[in-house]
């Protein structure tokens, strides 16, 4: 009996020591919808609001809108090609050099969300992205 308990203990130890796979925070099934409390902080200000992402057949559509319902950012993420397309940006951010940085950072943020990490910090431009999953935010 004692040998049996020792073998179970050793087996459990090895199972618990295996690296665990982080759960993706992106929508995974067709039509799945995920909502985040989103904050983008820059030196000159910040954007905050709700980000909704919906999984389509080949891409993930995302929209970031503020507390007043004004859409600040619409984008499409193509996971198979690792590309971001900005579909709509508010006037304040609608400059080629800002959109270039935004696309690069959103792509990195999507990679982080896929690994279960909900933040990204751009060291060069000092921009912080925080996407916190809202409770009961996943709909299928």
Model-derived segments and their meaning:
Residues 32-35, 57-58, 114-116:
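A short, compositionally biased
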Residues 1-5:
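Positively charged n-region of N-terminal signal peptides that target proteins for export
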Residues 7-17:
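Bacterial N-terminal signal peptides
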Residues 24, 37-39, 70, 79-140:
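Mature, soluble, non-transmembrane domains
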